[in-house]
């Protein structure tokens, strides 16, 4: 029986996605523990001379700091026409390659970079797979301070429970934009796309953690190795 650890599986998925990186690419650098493996592997290939003229677009201030420490040249969305490939993690993935993201609080920038990308490779271990979004993970929402309790009440009126995300010291968690995060336990979602549209239309919600139709590739590391799933596989897979 294969007993590879979660961290080993994260690294396996990251390595499979990093194999897509080519010289001259603009690379979206995701945020989170799994994406950090990919960033380190990209830096290693860069310093080995395998990747020339690449530049990274970080999805969070934490990612930017790591990339600078590793010597990866950086740019911004304002300075590039498009991102060739983004490699990022996810908190939950359904068989349609729809995602819940935002566990690290970087959902707004992550979504902006993903939307600007020609290809989005999501890297996860098999614990992130779910038959329906919301089954395993709360849905993060970035909200403004003004009226956040009213926003929370509106969410709970739709069903489920809402918690304001706190730091370890008990103070409210703040995003890179200075906003708050509400974590909404809304249960399995029958129609994530419809909910995404509803949340996008609600004033006070800056961004939600539903990523619909953005992932082009999924690399899942499990006991039997890494499985590569693409959008062409949707409708033929289940987990």
From Swiss-Prot:
CDD domains: RPI_A
Active site: 110 (proton acceptor)
GO terms classed as biological process: pentose-phosphate shunt, non-oxidative branch
Pathway(s) annotated for this protein in UniProt: Carbohydrate degradation; pentose phosphate pathway; D-ribose 5-phosphate from D-ribulose 5-phosphate (non-oxidative stage): step 1/1
EC numbers for this chain: 5.3.1.6
Broad enzyme group: isomerase
The family this protein is said to belong to: Belongs to the ribose 5-phosphate isomerase family.
HAMAP family listed in its UniProt record: Rib_5P_isom_A
PANTHER family, per the entry: RIBOSE-5-PHOSPHATE ISOMERASE 3, CHLOROPLASTIC-RELATED (PTHR43748:SF3)
Official protein name in the record: Ribose-5-phosphate isomerase A
Species per Swiss-Prot/TrEMBL record: Chloroflexus aurantiacus (strain ATCC 29366 / DSM 635 / J-10-fl)
Gene (name only): rpiA
């Amino acid at each position: 029986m294969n007993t590879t650890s979660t961290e080993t599986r994260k690294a396996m998925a990251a390595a499979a996605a990093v194999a897509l990186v080519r010289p001259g690419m603009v690379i979206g650098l995701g945020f989170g523990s799994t994406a950090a493996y990919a960033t380190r592997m990209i830096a290693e290939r860069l310093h080995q001379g395998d990747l020339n003229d690449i530049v990274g677009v970080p999805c969070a201030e934490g990612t930017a700091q790591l990339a600078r420490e590793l010597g990866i040249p950086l740019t911004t969305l304002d300075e590039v026409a498009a991102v060739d490939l983004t490699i990022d993690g996810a908190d939950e993935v359904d068989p349609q390659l729809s995602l819940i993201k935002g566990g690290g609080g970087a959902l707004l920038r992550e979504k902006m970079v993903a939307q600007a990308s020609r290809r989005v490779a999501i890297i996860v271990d098999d614990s992130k797979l779910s038959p329906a979004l919301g089954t395993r993970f709360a849905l993060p929402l970035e909200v403004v301070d003004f009226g956040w309790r009213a926003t929370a009440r509106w969410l709970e009126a739709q069903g489920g429970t809402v918690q304001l995300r706190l730091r370890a010291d008990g103070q409210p968690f703040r995003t890179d934009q200075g906003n708050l995060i509400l974590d909404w336990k809304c249960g399995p979602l029958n129609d994530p796309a419809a909910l995404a549209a509803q949340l996008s239309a609600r004033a006070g919600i800056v961004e939600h953690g539903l990523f619909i139709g953005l992932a082009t590739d999924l690399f899942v590391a499990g006991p039997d190795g890494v499985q590569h799933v693409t959008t062409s596989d949707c409708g033929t897979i289940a987990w």
